[in-house]
């Protein structure tokens, strides 16, 4: 009986050791699904290859089904790092108490959301009263939380102000809904809007921006708090070393819609936490 118990214990220890060894050799990375999965993977591939070179280890992109899945995976150490919106970071930080935001794009310190419509008669939110409206994901900082927060500050409660609100699930989907006439207006993050316009994926002769939110902090790359501090520091340095004057680096930065990456800290997202509490999205 004792020999069997020891054998089981040894087998468990070996399995655990192998798991930890595997985890140490592979950096598991994900991102909030604010765009189509194929687009997220396309944007990450060159960055992942760069990180592999800089870190000397395999980097694996792990897609997730929704925003809560990223929070849960980071909190349970099934992910090492993730690209998060400001609100998702707040959720992870409150859940774990130790998640670390490493870097953000330069523009994420002054991020905005764009209100769009295909109705030529809509010049402001006042013109959308009693009409239909779309947010992105309910957990999106730039596609839901912050636009909602600024609307509430202006005395607009979306649930009663609009005849119907919908959640498209992603910024590009919101633009598609508006262009197709599925809703009268919508809101999405400024970076995705600019990318869709540049790629010709939205008809600007039909869809227009009629308002922009005030600025707020948003996206960042966050690592789990239990990650080896030396590895976390290497990751941060790798991001900060991306130089737009280097053609290879610029290609990576362009896919991330970044001019460059800068350091960030948890305190930067206090305003987002306050907005989430004001909207009763945090208890």
Regions found by a protein language model. Give the residues of each.
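Bacterial N-terminal signal peptides
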Residues: 9-17
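Sec/Tat signal peptide C-region and signal peptidase I cleavage site
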Residues: 17-23
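An extracytoplasmic/periplasmic, membrane-proximal ligand-sensing/linker region
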Residues: 24-31, 35-46, 216-218, 222-283
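Extracytoplasmic small-molecule ligand-binding "clamshell" domains
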Residues: 24-88
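Short helices/loops that flank or line small-molecule/ion binding pockets
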Residues: 68-82, 95-96, 126-129, 170-191
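Hydrophobic/proline-rich hinge and linker segments of small-molecule sensing/allosteric domains
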Residues: 102-124, 221-224
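Flexible hinge/capping segments at coil-to-helix
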Residues: 117-137
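Pocket-lining segment of extracytoplasmic ligand-binding domains
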Residues: 131-230
């Amino acid at each position: 009986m004792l020999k069997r118990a020891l054998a089981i214990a040894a087998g468990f220890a070996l399995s655990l050791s192998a798991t930890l060894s595997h985890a140490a050799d592979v950096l598991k990375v994900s991102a909030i699904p604010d765009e189509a999965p194929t687009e997220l993977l396309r944007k990450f591939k060159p960055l992942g290859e760069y990180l592999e070179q800089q870190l000397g280890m395999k980097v694996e992109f792990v897609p997730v089904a929704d925003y809560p899945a990223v929070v849960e995976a980071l909190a349970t150490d099934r992910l090492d790092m993730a690209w998060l919106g400001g609100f998702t970071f707040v959720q992870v930080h409150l859940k774990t108490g130790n998640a670390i935001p490493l870097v953000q794009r330069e523009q994420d310190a002054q991020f905005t959301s764009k209100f769009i419509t295909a109705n030529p008669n809509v010049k402001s939110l006042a013109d959308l009263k009693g009409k239909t409206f779309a947010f992105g994901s309910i957990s999106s900082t730039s596609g839901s939380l912050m636009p909602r927060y600024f609307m509430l500050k202006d005395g607009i409660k979306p649930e009663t102000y609009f005849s119907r609100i919908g959640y498209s699930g992603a910024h590009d989907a919101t633009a598609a809904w508006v262009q197709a006439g599925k809703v009268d207006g919508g809101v999405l993050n400024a970076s995705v809007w600019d990318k869709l316009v540049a790629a010709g994926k939205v008809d600007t002769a039909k869809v227009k921006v009629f308002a922009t939110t005030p600025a707020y902090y948003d996206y960042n790359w966050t690592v789990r708090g239990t990650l080896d501090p030396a590895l976390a520091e290497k990751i941060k340095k790798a991001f900060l070393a991306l130089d737009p004057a280097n053609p290879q680096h610029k290609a990576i930065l362009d896919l991330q819609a970044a001019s460059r990456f800068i350091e960030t800290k948890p305190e930067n997202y206090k305003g987002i936490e306050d907005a989430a509490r004001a909207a009763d999205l945090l208890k």
